[in-house]
Design a protein with these regions (language model features):
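Extended substrate-binding grooves/exosites of carbohydrate-active enzymes
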Residues: 266-291
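Active-site cradle of extracellular carbohydrate-active enzymes
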Residues: 64-74, 120-128, 160
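Non-catalytic accessory regions flanking glycosidase/transglycosidase catalytic cores in CAZymes
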Residues: 1-27, 32-56, 60, 106, ...
C-alpha cells in the first residue's frame, strides 16, 4: 500500500472525504493486554474485525504491538513476577525478565502464524519495546532509572527483532529509527520516522528532519532499506498546525520523496484546503506508480498454441512494491467472459524507480478455446492472484481494475 494512512479510522471522528486524501492503508496500534487478555487466549477477533472494516474501505492493515502504552502488558503477565513501573502514559515492564520474553515470543509467534502471510496485512511495525512501542524511554519522566534498568539489553533487543523477522517472514516490516534499525534493515526491514515535517517544531536549535534522520541514514544499509522494505512516516503534530505556523511545505514534501516514502500517517486529521493540491501532487509520486510504456504480442494464435507477450514498464514513483504481487494477462470474449488467464514469473518487487527490465512471457492458449477475436487485458494482482490489486497509471481501466489494451485473434 501507499499514500496517506487511515489512523485507527479517525478514532471515531474520521475527517470528511474532502478533508483527507483517499487511503489504502489502515494503521492500528494495540496494547498486548488487548491482544492477549487472558494467558494463551489471543484476541484475533479484534484484529479480524478491523481487517473486515478496512477491506470495506478498500484498505489493507498495518499494525504495531505495544507493551507499555495505556493498558500495556497484561496484568496476568505482571502477576507472574515481571517487574514494572508506572509512568506518564502507562506501565513500563521489565523487558529483560525471562517470563516477559517467553510470553512475548509466544504472542508474536501466534500473530505471525495467523497474519504473517495474510493478503490483508500491508506491513508490520516492529514495536513491542519502550514508550508507545517506539524503542525509547521518553515517557519515563521521574522514573528514568527504573525504565533504564527495565529497557532490554542489546541481546534481548536483537532477540525480539528476530521474532518479527522469523514469524512475519512473508510480511513487509518497518522499524523506527533507533533501537535495532540497522540490524532489522540488514534483514530486509524498512524504516519509519515519527516526527516527519519537524524543521523547528520543538526547538530552533534541533529538529528531526535535519538532526535525527540524516545521521541514521549515513548507514548505507538504512539509506538503501527502501529497496526492500517500506518507508513509513508519521507527521509531527498535525498538518493543520504546520499550516498555521507557516512551515515550508515544499521543503518537507521534497524530503519525503528523497527518502523514498511509501506511507504517510497524517493521523487522520484534516489537511488544509489551501494545501490539498500540493498534497495531491505529492501523492502521485510517493510509493510506486507503474506506467506500461509498450506492449507487443502475437497478433494471432491457435488453441494449444503459444502467445508471446513482451512489455516495457516504468515506475514513476519513488519506491517499489513490497509484496509479491504478480503481473497477469487474460483473454476476454465478446460476452465479457474470461476464457484464459496467466501470471508472469516477473518479480515486480525489483521494479525500482525508473525503467523496469523488459518482461517477456510466452503463454499457452487453452486447447478448448474457440476461434474468434478476444480482448487482451493486463493487471497486477494481489498475492493470492484472486483479484486485480494495483491501479496503473495508464488508460483502459475496467471496473475490476484490469486494463483493456489490445485484441488477439484465435484461428
Amino acid at each position: 500500500g501507499m499514500g496517506f494512512a487511515d489512523f485507527h479510522f479517525g478514532f471515531g471522528h474520521p475527517p470528511a472525504p474532502e478533508e483527507y486524501p483517499h487511503t489504502t492503508v489502515a494503521y492500528f496500534r494495540w496494547p498486548w493486554a488487548e491482544l492477549e487478555p487472558k494467558e494463551g487466549q489471543y484476541n484475533f477477533a479484534l484484529v479480524d474485525r478491523v481487517i473486515e472494516q478496512a477491506k470495506a474501505k478498500g484498505e489493507t492493515l498495518a499494525i504495531r504491538i505495544v507493551s507499555e502504552y495505556k493498558t500495556g502488558s497484561p496484568q496476568w503477565l505482571l502477576d507472574k513476577g515481571v517487574g514494572s513501573v508506572k509512568e506518564s502514559d502507562g506501565i513500563f515492564p521489565d523487558y529483560n525478565h525471562p517470563v516477559f520474553l517467553d510470553y512475548h515470543e509466544r504472542l508474536i509467534r501466534a500473530f505471525g502464524e495467523r497474519y504473517g502471510r495474510s493478503v490483508d496485512i500491508d506491513h508490520v511495525d516492529i514495536g513491542s519495546i519502550g514508550c508507545w512501542g517506539e524503542w525509547n524511554t521518553v515517557c519515563c519522566e521521574g522514573v528514568e532509572a527504573q525504565c533504564k534498568a527495565f529497557f532490554p539489553t542489546e541481546a534481548n533487543q536483537i532477540a525480539i527483532t528476530d521474532w518479527y523477522l522469523k514469524y512475519f517472514a512473508g510480511t513487509p516490516l518497518v522499524m523506527l529509527h533507533g533501537g535495532q534499525l540497522k540490524y532489522a534493515a540488514s534483514h530486509g526491514a524498512g524504516w519509519r520516522g515519527d516526527c516527519f515535517g519537524d524543521y523547528g517544531y520543538f526547538s530552533p536549535d534541533w529538529n528531526h528532519m535535519e538532526h535525527a534522520y540524516p545521521p541514521v541514514l549515513e548507514e548505507a544499509v538504512i539509506a538503501n532499506a527502501w529497496k526492500r522494505g517500506p518507508v513509513q512516516m508519521e507527521v509531527c503534530g498535525y498538518i493543520h498546525e504546520w499550516y498555521e505556523r507557516g512551515f515550508d511545505l515544499d521543503r518537507i514534501l521534497n524530503q519525503g520523496l528523497e527518502w523514498h516514502l511509501s506511507v504517510l500517517n497524517a493521523k487522520s486529521k484534516p489537511v488544509p484546503a489551501a494545501w490539498r493540491p500540493r498534497f495531491n501532487e505529492f501523492l502521485k509520486r510517493i510509493g510506486y506508480r507503474f506506467v506500461l510504456r509498450e506492449l507487443t504480442h502475437s497478433a494471432e494464435s491457435h488453441p494449444g498454441g503459444p502467445l508471446v507477450l513482451q512489455s516495457r514498464w516504468e515506475n514513476k514513483g519513488v519506491a517499489p512494491i513490497y509484496h509479491a504481487w504478480p503481473l497477469a494477462y487474460r483473454l476476454r470474449s465478446s460476452s465479457d467472459q474470461v476464457v484464459a488467464q496467466w501470471t508472469s514469473p516477473a518479480d515486480l518487487k525489483q521494479w525500482l524507480p525508473g525503467p523496469s527490465p523488459r518482461v517477456e512471457d510466452t503463454v499457452v492458449v487453452p486447447e478448448t478455446l474457440s476461434a474468434g477475436s478476444y480482448a487482451l487485458d493486463v493487471a497486477i494482482l494481489s498475492e493470492d492472484a484472486r483479484s486485480a490489486h494495483v491501479e496503473l497509471a495508464i488508460e483502459g481501466k475496467r471496473a475490476d481494475r484490469w486494463y483493456a489494451l489490445s485484441r488477439v485473434e484465435i484461428r
